[in-house]
Amino acid sequence: MTDPRSQTPDLATLDDQLCFAIYSANTAINRMYRPYLSKLGLTYPQYIALLALWETDDVTVGALGKRLYLDTNTLTPLLKRLEGMGHLTRTRDPKDERVVRIRLTDQGRALQAQATDALACVHAMASEADMDLKPWIEALNHLREQALKKAQCAGG
């Protein structure tokens, strides 16, 4: 039996797709984080929202969505759940009622210290693989920016 890839050289296989390599790596990394985050009662998207807020607190929903590359319709339910858990507050901006501001609570700020296990896990994985994460992060950030530019040119 012949390899189907040899019969269709112009068609890229799944393993040759950049999008699949990134997607499957992301899935594996999410699985690596899951046991640590479940101890905190968090999902990965909730965790990255908190990471952004630990970096810069008291932001608008729009600014947080832009920082996380999430649409408002995805971010709002996530923030409502975090608010229900007591990690943040959502309040209307007194200067513009259309704007919702996000602020960490004391509980949300305290969670940062507990989340260090998840971060240590990733760094341990990189150390075991003898990898310096900095160049990977820089390359992926550059790739993201280029993809966003192409998406804008294509009207996406």
What residue ranges belong to the model's regions?
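Charged, amphipathic alpha-helical coiled-coil/dimerization segments
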Residues: 30, 58, 80-138
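Central "turn" residue of the DNA-binding helix-turn-helix
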Residues: 41, 57-58, 69
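Helix-turn-helix DNA-binding elements, focusing on the entry/boundary residues of the two helices
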Residues: 61
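Short alpha-helical "packing" element that flanks the helix-turn-helix/winged-helix DNA-binding module
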Residues: 49-50
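C-terminal regulatory/oligomerization modules of transcriptional regulators
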Residues: 1-10, 113-116, 128-156
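N-terminal leader segment of winged-helix/HTH proteins
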Residues: 1-40, 134-135
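The alpha-helix within a helix-turn-helix
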Residues: 65
